[in-house]
Amino acid sequence: MFIGQTRFSLFVPQSGSWRASNGKKLSSEADYRAYLYDPQRMEFRTNHFIEHTVPLLAQAARGHEVTHIVSFSESLPQRWKSRLEEAGQQYDFLWLDERKDGEQAWDTPQAVIRASGHTGVYGSYRLDDDDMLATGFFDAAQPYLAEPFVGMFVSFPLGVEAIFDGTHFSNFRLAHVPMNSMGLMALCSIDAEKNIRAPKGGPHDLTDRYSPVILDARHVSYLRSLHDGQDNAMRYQDGSVLERLLHETGKNPPLHDYDQLASAFPTVAARIDQGAQEFAVGEAVGEGVGFALAEQGARGVADVTIVLSLNSEEPIGPEHFVVYLLVVDAQGRKLPRHQAVAGLKSIKRGRIGHCHLMPVKEGQSRVVVSLHLEQGQSLQGFCVKGLEPKAQKVSLETVSVAADAAFHSVDAARFAALVDHTPLRVQDRVHDLLVDRWDSIRAVATRVLGQQRAEWALAKLRLLYRRIRRLASR
C-alpha cells in the first residue's frame, strides 16, 4: 500500500519554511495570506495539479493500492475548494483533508493508514502540487515494500525538469537529484495494534543524515515544473526567476527521447501535441531539411518544442546528427557562435552555430528538441542535418512544431541563404572568424615568422581579440 500527501497551499504562518524561502519579502501574516491565495498563483497551481499531477497519479496507481491525501486549510477560498472537491469525486484514490488554519497536517498520513485497516509494509511519500510522478512510479517502488527495507527511505533521483508557463512545457532537461522531494518514500510498517515503524526523517535533501536511503535511478520517475511562481524562487530579484532557472537547468543534459517522455508523462506529451504544426517529410535529411517562420519579417519565437519522427538503418552518435537553431537578438541580429545561450551548444563544424546534438536509435524513433530562450532572444528557423554520410541517410518522416508562430519547410539552400542574410555585427563576425581560424593562424604565423616572433605576434593578436570581445559584449 502507498500513502501520499500533497500539502495544497496550507496556511501556516508560524511555519519557518515559508519564511526561509521567501527572501524576507513577506513581512506579515497578511502579506503571507495575500501571497498564498493570490488568484493568479492559485489558478496556476490548481490547474497544474488537476490537469497533470492527479491524472498521472491515477495512471501510476493502476494495479496498486494507493491513497493520496490532499491537505488544505479551511481559509482556502471556496473557488479552489470546489475544484478539489470535483477532483475528489472523479478520482476515488484522493483523500481530501481540510485542516484548521495554522495546522501543518504532518500527522494525516499516519491517521489514514491506521484507519485503513492495513497491516504490514507500506510506503509513505510526498508530492508538491506543481510536480508530477511518472506513470511507472509505483511499479518502480513496489519491490521496496518488503520487511528488510522498513526503516529506510527510497529516493528516485532520475527525472525531468521543464519550464512551464501555464500553457506550454519546454526546455526539457534530464536531472539527477538524490533525495529530491518528488516522491521521496519512507518505508514503514503497521501491525494489528496500529503500531507504526517508520524511518526518522528531516529536511529531504539531508535525509541520509537521519536514516539509510536507497537510490534507484534506473527509470525517469518525476517531472519538476519550473515557473516564475515557485515559492522557493521568491529569493531571486523580480524578473530574474526564469533567467536563473534557465541557467541552472542548462547545466543538465537535454532530454531527447520523446517516446520516453510521452510514456512517463502522457499529459505533458498531449499538451505538446495539442495545436502543433505537422509536416510530412518522408526523405533523408541529407545536408539539411530546414524550417523557417512562415511570415517574412515576423518576430521569432522564444518558446518552441520540435518533435522529429526518424527512421535509421543503424544507430547514430550525437556528434553526427544535429538540429541547427538560428537564434537572433531583439534587433533581429544573428547571435554569434561565441555567445553562450542557456541550454544550447555551439559548434564550428559545417557553418553551424547554436544547436542540439542528439543520438539517433536504430529503427523508428521520435526525438524532441525543446527550448525556452532568454528575454530578447528568439528563434527564426531550424535545420535538421547529418554531419557524416551515414547520418545523412537517416529518414526524416515527420516534423511537429509547437510554437506561437507558423513555420514552413525550406530546402537546405534556402535555409543557408536565410542564415547568410540574417545580419551579424562586424565585431561578432570578426570574433567568430578569429575563434574559428585560431589554430590555422598560429600554424601559419609559426611557419612564416618562426616560433619566437610568432608568439609575440599572437600575443598582440590576443590583445586585439580581447578588445573585440569587449565590443561584442556591448
Give names to the regions the model predicted:
Residues V54-E65:
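Short, acidic, metal-binding catalytic loop of nucleotide-sugar glycosyltransferases
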Residues M1-H52:
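N-proximal low-complexity "stem/linker" segments adjacent to membrane-targeting elements
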Residues Q5-F8, V12-S15, S189-Y324, D329-G332, ...:
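C-terminal catalytic/acceptor-binding lobe
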Residues A30-P39, W80-Y122:
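Active-site-proximal specificity loops/subdomain of glycosyltransferases
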Residues G102-G117, A134-V213:
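Conserved catalytic core of nucleotide-sugar-dependent glycosyltransferases
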Residues A406-R474:
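Membrane-proximal basic amphipathic "stem/tether" segments
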Residues E65-S75, D97-R99:
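Short beta-strand/loop segment that forms part of the nucleotide-sugar
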Residues G120-M132:
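Short beta-strand-to-loop acidic/aromatic patch adjacent to the donor-nucleotide binding site
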